[in-house]
Design a protein with these regions (language model features):
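A Zn2+-metalloprotease active-site environment signal
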Residues: 2-7, 17-252
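A glycine-rich, hydrophobic loop/mini-helix early in the fold
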Residues: 10
């Protein structure tokens, strides 16, 4: 998935809490350094993920515990396990038509009802496995490091002024645009696909759902309907890669 929504939520939280004394000229000229690597510890990534997840949950419509969506996701979650590299995970459903899902470094896993409406349990398992892969393989951490590479966001993160302030809409838009354009590379997407395949095999789950989920997404792409895989390698190629792995492993 794209880091867009996650990083935008994170950046906005940082900006609104600590930029009151930032020089606007410096902010507008920071574009040349927009994608410099910014060093973050695992603890910092987790803390920032906590903020971003809380912000997104606050803006979303969450499915209640009694919802059939939540009950279904809980069943799926029990099959996938309760941690990513030792980090405990928690699952929630966003009631929205988007075909999307994401995972954060703090174990925050969110699935949109639109994706659940479109896919079988096996396919949802595969998609979640893919998102877990982005966390386990360090892609999420790298994405945050890139997004936090701007002088503007770096200053916001380091600010200790303590006085709540805000930037103008144009300034927020300038920084937000840099954050919104952050996304995983095709190589990272392919690595996450293989992670999901291996995870499903390890958990005794048939990986065919990974291939069929891509085939469904290929139909969305043909109809030009936006989905979580807009920036990923072609879905047909990804489906074939999974079927090739299944054939090599003797799985029908």
């Amino acid at each position: 998935m794209k880091m867009r929504a996650i990083v935008l939520a994170l950046g906005t939280t940082l900006l609104l809490s600590g930029c009151q004394n930032m020089d606007s000229n410096g902010l507008m000229t920071s574009g040349a350094e927009a994608f410099q690597a910014y060093s973050l510890s695992d603890a910092q990534v987790k803390a920032l993920s906590d903020q971003a997840c809380k912000d997104m949950d606050g803006k979303a419509t969450l499915a209640p515990a009694s919802s059939t969506y939540t009950q279904r996701l809980n069943k799926i979650a029990s099959a996938l396990g309760d941690n990513i590299n030792g980090q405990p995970v928690n699952y929630k459903v966003y009631m929205a038509k988007d075909v999307n899902a994401f995972a954060m470094a703090n174990g925050c896993i969110r699935v949109y009802s639109g994706l659940m409406d479109m896919m079988t349990d096996n396919e949802v398992e595969a998609v979640i496995g893919h998102e877990m892969g982005h966390v386990a393989l360090g892609h999420v951490k790298k994405g945050m490091q890139v997004a936090l590479g701007t002088n503007a966001i770096r200053a916001a993160a380091a600010s200790a002024g303590g006085i709540v302030g805000s930037l103008s809409q144009s300034q927020l838009g300038d920084v937000g645009e840099k954050l919104v354009n952050s996304q995983f590379s095709q190589r990272q997407e392919s690595e996450a696909d293989d992670y999901s395949y291996d995870l499903l095999r390890k958990r005794g789950i048939n990986p065919s759902g990974l291939a069929t989920s891509f085939e469904k997404l290929a139909k969305l792409e043909a109809g030009r309907q936006s989905s979580m895989f807009d920036d990923h390698p072609a879905s047909e190629e990804r489906a074939q890669h999974i079927r090739d792995r299944m054939a090599a492993d003797g799985i029908k």
